Regions:
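N-terminal small/polar loop signature for handling phosphorylated ligands or for N-terminal nucleophile
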Residues: 1-23, 28-31, 187-195, 227, ...
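Single-stranded nucleic-acid-binding OB-fold domains
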Residues: 360-365, 384-389, 402-413
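Hydrophobic helix-and-loop "lid/oligomerization" segment in the mid-to-C-terminal part
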Residues: 6-7, 58-294, 300, 320, ...
Length: 427
């Protein structure tokens, strides 16, 4: 609005589901706005901008501009578009898989931006055998740490730095912020778990959490952890730090299959006008702002809306598996074949299930369960992330076959996803 008042032409790009009222811009570029026939609806924000650049280049080509100046090679940006696609956890439809695959190809050829190269170095990762999983868990959190605790500028400056030394300086600053983020996240997660222990109804259809000491940039991570632990849609709130927004709290939510979080917030907004000051998001993740004094009303409305729209069996976590494997399948060739494919939302990595003998188990960093398993005389290493409770001597486990890279070595490792017991079923 300010730019329009100053006489500037304003172009807004977005990829979220649009609100009823669009921004006051000259052009709104969003494949998800009503009436837009662009076929790729699952693009992340960087993906939308990439296609806008492609369209702009095409228009300039038709105008004859490139008869006078060199045509830019936009493929040099595909590593950043791939990183953004992975980091934003958008559905990996056919087009997004192509983007990520091409981006990883260039990274493995060492044809990547200086900023991404610097981030891989501080993360201790090698560009020549990088995977989508490593970009998701090693690079993306370091970029996001800036926006969570400081300002997004640091991440942007790192990624657009043209020279390696400058990019590495920014990457090191992001590394320090990420370490700080981990500490704060652990503290907030412990607070959240303690709060849930005092809730009136631990079996409620949804969870709302708020602490005046929490950081608004980290509540989404807390909501994600609690959602995973309790398998309930979860929204975590923290005080707004924006000037002039005193008395408001910002929430970040994560949902489960069967509960569309943004549509749930939209229903609450229609039934309780003015309760939600602003909101937006997707089916599994959303953000919102409300007044602190309205939290009890919102919590009641949220649980009611979730329960109303929950299909039968929504709150029972079932792990779908692709079948059992033979001990002879536990090889690096199988692991490498699976690792070579780009997996993600809407294109999930295969999960297998077998009965194992648990030979040894120990906690790593008091957080992850490291396992030595055996099946029909074949030994295999495994890990269960964020699992502290020990396993029985024999267990029927759901798992992914992964390549573990550590100290320059690549080894096969099972990543445990679930265990069959009386409460959870493997289908």
């Amino acid at each position: 609005k300010y730019a329009k008042e100053k006489g500037l032409t304003v172009i807004v790009t977005d990829h979220h589901l649009p609100a009823d009222a669009l921004p006051e811009a000259d052009f709104v570029v969003n494949p998800n706005q009503h009436g837009d026939d662009f076929p790729s609806k699952a693009l992340c924000g960087a993906g939308v901008m990439f296609y806008l650049l492609l369209a702009t280049r095409s228009a300039l080509r038709e105008m004859g501009v490139y008869s006078r100046v060199p045509q830019p090679n936009l493929l040099t940006l595909i590593d950043l578009v791939a990183l953004a696609t992975i980091a934003d956890v958008v559905p990996l439809d056919r087009n997004n898989r192509i983007i990520v695959t091409k981006g990883i190809e260039r990274i493995r050829q060492n044809k990547l931006q200086s900023g991404l190269s610097a981030l891989l170095k501080v993360a201790g990762r090698n560009c020549f055998d990088i995977s989508a999983t490593e970009l998701a868990f090693s690079v993306a959190p370091r970029i996001n740490a800036a926006g969570r605790l400081s300002t997004n500028d640091l991440g942007v400056y790192c990624l657009i730095s043209a020279d390696a030394p400058t990019a590495f300086d920014f990457a090191q600053k992001l590394e320090e912020l990420n370490k700080e983020r981990k500490v704060k996240e652990r503290e907030m997660q412990q607070d959240a778990l303690s709060s849930i222990g005092t809730l009136d109804d631990p079996e409620a259809p949804a969870i709302c959490l708020y602490d005046p000491t929490w950081h608004s940039g980290i509540v989404g991570l807390v909501a994600s952890r609690i959602k995973d632990s309790y398998y309930r849609p979860t929204i975590a709130f923290a005080p707004s730090t924006e000037e002039g927004r005193e008395g408001e709290i910002k929430g970040s939510g994560r949902s489960i299959n069967g509960i569309h979080l943004r549509d749930t917030l939209d229903l609450i907004n229609k039934n309780h006008p003015g309760l939600i000051l602003k909101f937006g998001g997707h089916s599994l993740a959303a953000g919102l702002t409300i007044k602190e004094k309205d939290l009890p009303v919102f919590e009641k409305a949220f649980k009611k809306a979730v329960l109303k729209n929950a299909p039968s069996g929504t709150f029972v976590k079932n792990t779908l598996v692709d079948g059992e494997l033979a001990p002879s399948d536990f090889t690096m060739s199988v692991a490498n074949a699976i690792d070579s494919i780009v997996w993600g939302p809407s294109f999930p990595e295969p999960i297998f299930a077998n009965r194992f003998v648990v030979k040894n188990q120990k906690l790593l960093k008091d957080t992850h369960l490291k396992l030595d398993l055996e099946m029909d005389g074949v030994a295999v290493s495994a890990i269960w992330f964020r699992r502290k409770k020990p396993l029985p001597e024999r267990a029927y486990l759901a798992y992914k076959i992964c390549v573990n890279q550590w100290a320059g070595r690549r080894t096969l490792q099972l990543v445990i996803e679930d265990m069959e017991d009386e409460e959870e079923r493997l289908l």
